[in-house]
């Protein structure tokens, strides 16, 4: 349940279907529910969509019609293009949106419309998290809270109307997570939210998510983004999910 999925339907005169966790666990039944209700917009996590896409592949011979122009909004996790392309085999008119945003910034901070090529396939090596939505500002900053050049990884800070007032009765946590905007010192009420997410700006102006700052591994003096390795592993046809975990050898050194 998110702000975007809860309120958007009412802005366009659509109906909202909210299912219990039990009903969404059975992806075969979920797939048929989407078909029976003629769902035109689906908001779902990438891991849940992966199960849904696999279920459709398993039921390849079944007739499960869906609206031709259905839109699928994914968010909260890294997206597998394999799942998207598997789905497009059955529903070539469907299109996907990658939505990014933490709860502290009212969930929706950036979005990316995922393009398809001439063969109606997604051929991106990694799906970006896109550009900021209206009334939202994004900053990629280094540890000195200075701007990072395009292509250089840094921590993502979010500003704008969607930034919350903070955590209830947690002043220490608020001071760490919500910081004064160093680029607008004239307004002391203007704050940025530190996401802890490491991103970089692509040549297109879109943001690419690289991982969590607290998931960086320092190995023999090199800072390694575990998320980048995980993303590369997931692109292999024999890999469904991947997690990179540092280990220590007998001497206690990371390997």
Which stretches of residues belong to each language-model region?
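Conserved AMP-binding/adenylation subdomain of ANL enzymes
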Residues: 2-40
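Gly/Ser/Thr-rich phosphate-binding loop
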Residues: 7, 11-16, 39-43, 53-124, ...
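Structural motif
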Residues: 21-22, 45-47, 76
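Glycine-/small-residue-rich active-site loops that bind phosphorylated ligands and cofactors
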Residues: 23-26, 79, 250
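Short hydrophobic/charged patches on amphipathic alpha-helices used for structural packing
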Residues: 28-31, 61, 230-231
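AMP-dependent adenylate-forming
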Residues: 45, 50, 81, 89-98, ...
């Amino acid at each position: 349940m998110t702000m975007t999925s809860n309120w958007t339907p009412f802005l366009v005169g659509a109906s909202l279907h909210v299912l219990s966790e039990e009903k969404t666990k059975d992806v075969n039944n979920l797939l048929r529910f989407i078909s029976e209700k003629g769902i035109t917009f689906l908001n779902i996590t990438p891991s849940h969509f992966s199960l849904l896409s696999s279920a459709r592949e398993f039921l390849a011979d079944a007739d499960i019609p869906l609206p031709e122009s259905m839109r699928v909004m994914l968010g909260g996790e890294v997206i597998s293009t394999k799942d998207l392309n598997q789905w497009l085999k059955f529903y070539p008119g469907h299109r996907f949106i990658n939505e990014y945003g933490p709860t502290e910034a009212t969930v929706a901070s950036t979005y990316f419309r995922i393009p398809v090529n001439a063969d109606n396939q997604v051929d991106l090596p990694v799906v970006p998290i896109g550009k900021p939505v209206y009334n939202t500002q994004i900053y990629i900053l280094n540890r000195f809270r200075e701007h990072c050049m395009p292509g250089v990884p840094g921590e993502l800070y979010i500003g704008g109307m969607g930034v919350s007032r903070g955590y209830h009765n947690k002043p220490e946590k608020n001071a760490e997570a919500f910081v004064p905007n160093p680029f607008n010192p004239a307004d002391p009420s203007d704050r940025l939210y530190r996401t802890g997410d490491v991103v970089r700006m692509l040549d297109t102006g879109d943001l690419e998510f690289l991982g969590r700052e607290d998931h960086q591994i320092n190995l023999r003096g090199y800072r390694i983004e575990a998320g980048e390795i995980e993303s590369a592993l997931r692109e292999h046809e024999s890999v469904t999910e991947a997690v990179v975990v540092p280990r220590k050898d007998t001497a206690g050194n990371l390997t």
